Amino acid sequence: MEQQIHQAVEIALSGTADPTLKNQAFEFINHIKSTEEGYKACVDILIKSSNESINDGLKFFVYQVIDENIDKLSQEQVFTLNQELFKCLSSYINNNLQDPTHLRNKFAQILAKQFCQVYINIYPNFIKDLLELINVSEATSTNPNNLLAIDYYTRVLIGIHSEIGDKYITRSQEIHNRNNLLKDAIRTQDMQQMVTSWIQILTNPSFAHSEEILNNTLKIVGQYVSWMEISLFISPEFINTVFSFLQNSKLRNTTCETLIDIISKKMAPQNKLELLSLLNLTEFIGTLNLIEKNKNDDDDEDEDVEFMEFVAKLLNQIGQELLIVLENQSGLLEQVNAQLFKLWPAILGCLNHNYDDVSQNVFPFLQQFLTLSKKNPQLYTVDLMSTLLNKLILKMRFDDDDDGVSDEDTQAQFLDFRAKLKSFQDTIALLEPQLYLEAIPVIINESIFETNVDDVNWRKVELGLYQLNGFSDSIRNNVFQISRNEINQSKPYLIFQEFLIKLINSDLIMKINHPMIQSNFFELIVKHYNFLVSRESNFELIIKILQIFTSPLGLFNENEKVRIRSWYLFFRFIKLTKPKLDNEALIESIVVKMQPLLVIKAELPTKDEDDDIVENGNFNNQQYLFETMGLLISLIPNELSQLKSKLIDLIFQPIFNDLEKCISIPESQREPIVILQAHHSLQAIGTLVRGYDYESGLKFLPDVVAKIDNAAQVVLITLENFSSHEMIRDATRFAFARFIPIFKSDNDNNNKNNLIISQHLSKLITIIWSSSNLKISEYSDFLSFLGQIVHNFRTDDNIYQLLNNFITPLFQKIFQVLQNPVTEDENLRPDIIRDKNSLKRATLNFISSIVMNHLSSLLITESNKQELPEIIGKVFEYSYDLSDTTTSKLAIVQLTNFVNVFGGSGGKLDDKEDKYSENLPPIEGIDEFLINKVINLSFELPFQKQEFNLNDAQYRLIAQEIAILLKSFELKKHDEFIVVLSNYLLNMGLSQDLCNDFCLNLHNLDLKDFKKYFISFINKMKSGK
């Protein structure tokens, strides 16, 4: 079998072996791993390997098999294996067998695992035998066998740590308990000798050049110190030796980690303080002069920076341990402060380091210190906070080698780094608001306003803008603890307002051609618009800001990122400030200046390397400009009506020309880009009108309404010519949804235009509805659009007639679409089911829109009353369907609406606000129909549907809606409903007492209490109690 194993491993590792043969080899290998016969064969191979050479691949496989079988062995087998492993180890050492690192690690891992099996009950001399093998006290650098022995020794101890001491590995309680017993046994039997051996290795000059052994030994000290006796580790000889490694470039990083592990050991506060005082690490690190070197050397070598990161981690841990001492024993404040006083220069030096990776390693200490300072102000002095604040602010500045543009990842990392610094600054502001109030304005003033414009550093100005923005946040968060009524007259508020005004009036921003400055300026202005609108005297500042926005600094910026962002910010600024624009020349110049930005150029989307659709072009952002144009024109006083009309034409006409070009292209020659261009043009029209409508309460001028009417005609002509394209239908609905508020306003004030509006909508509905390729999602959007029409024109006779003619074909088509089976690609099935559920909800919402806007008469006119039973039937059907609980709940809500308008007056529509209902005859039998169907639904749904579980919030909501439905009917029909309900419950087998109780509660309880009762009733009946 040994030969077979050898061959199988060779084939498995071969890159040229026949695939079939390779599969057979893997099957054989897996068989070997899982059988006792295979395990024994591998042990035999291992025994022979101590005397004869085998290849590395086979040896690693043998190690794997043994490793995977150790936990399955009997005690006798474990004992035997232990003997063989030690024989192998002894042979490797005596023969100086220099296996590759991965083989040595694997063998050490096996020994570590074996240790866990044998140390307590089977072979307590495990560690003693290891120590005897290495004979560290007689080790010399000229004895290679001894070096190999110690190498294996350190690897085995690292493996043992992984098995019993690594706190980052999750273990079962059983293994956790076993590990505690192993640690106890080590402490009792071998701890003293183990620690002595480590000290001997570290202090033996023979190993001075054996870096891997020393590194591993330092790691071991750090790993084991957490659960061993600390006194064994802190002899002067040991400490001095460890400290000396801080000056060894190959060992110093590990040394820092070891020292962190030593000082992190859990112990009583007083003992921890004594340990830190004894080690006196801060003073020793100071002797290395690392901080001063950083100040004077801008060209640190990489390894020096890496070492400084470890030193920073060590200093951070010292600080955190001191703070933990204070948290656990507040009486030690004086001693803690004394040690912190010695620590702060090194901490501040790390914070001030040229490399952010070094600085952020002391962040945990700073966070802990500032948090604790809130509870314990004696922990700091104002001078310390002042120094720390200055260091934090200086560190927030962009590095001199960062241009702030090229590398977005680097910039994102820095902004995240700066955000952490800012959180520390904010805490200092809370602790010492007066210090903050004195320091920050000085920084802002020096950074922005005392800068030589001809020799300006953008990084300095950017820091000033950042601090100015942060200063306003401090005011908003009331860091200065000022009464709300006095904030606007407070010193901080006035300082900020003065800075903001000074910034706007300054030429500095205009002269610094850097994206960060330009972008931050506009963000700052828009964020603090309320400082500008709070006073009439600031109107000139707003005008100046408009001019800056429309300069090459903003909307026309050469940097695309700044340019695109400024389009949105310009829109936000106009919308928030709503300036009174009565200067014709200024307004016209702004609009004319912006015209080049309003040229629409469609670009087809592409796919990226992941096959995802990527939108091209800037049209989505460009829409902010169109919306802004609409808003600007709406802000022009009505006295300047000619200017309004002129500017609307100025913006609309290029779009109309674009649409005319698109329409003129024969359908057979229309490329996708033509359709997209037409879509963008329609979207732009709708977006501009949406901007105009932002000024709520406006009375729209007849000339303006006429312009919108003309735009509506252009949109409809475009739709006629592109009716088969979904994106054109979508854009048309989008545009008309924005026209409606203006048409409605004019409709309310000018009845002669009613017919024109209804004609537009009639044509729109007809064209869209006649399209043969409508998607399910489009039906949902269309119903939502119709709901908007119902709401806005509920009193318009022409619109009523339009809807009356359309209701029946609408519902018939919708129900047909929902009834159609899924015939498309099976992969599309989830999407189609989702879209159909959305359409059901859209249908229910449309019904709700009809009822809630007092147009229920539409459902019972001569044209539509034949469809009413089908509509009500579908609503009941959706109520019963619990595969989509949201739809079910919504359907029950609509049943309540039906009950309220049809369920109480003998079939006569019961809605006094429905002006069209009076001349309509009652619907015979609808009362009885609804009563029976509602009662059936109310009890079949919770009691016959197995999935109906009141522990699920969705089903609980449905139950509450059923309670509302029952209560609504009871309020409508009173005793008549109670009688039918009582008979139903008795027929279903409910006792007379329970039936009486239910009907009595339905009659007597208010809605809130009946909902609770109904939930309780369902729970009680379903549990059988």
From Swiss-Prot:
It is found in: Nucleus; Cytoplasm. One of its GO terms (molecular function) is small GTPase binding. Keywords: Cytoplasm, Nucleus, RNA-binding, Transport, tRNA processing, tRNA-binding. SUPFAM superfamilies: ARM repeat (SSF48371). It comes from the Eukaryota. InterPro entries: ARM-like (IPR011989), ARM-type_fold (IPR016024), Exportin-1/Importin-b-like (IPR013598), Exportin-T_C (IPR045546), XPOT (IPR040017). GO terms for biological process: tRNA processing; tRNA re-export from nucleus. GO terms for cellular component: cytoplasm; nuclear matrix; nuclear pore. Belongs to the exportin family. tRNA nucleus export receptor which facilitates tRNA translocation across the nuclear pore complex. Involved in pre-tRNA splicing, probably by affecting the interaction of pre-tRNA with splicing endonuclease. This is Exportin-T. It comes from Candida albicans (strain SC5314 / ATCC MYA-2876).
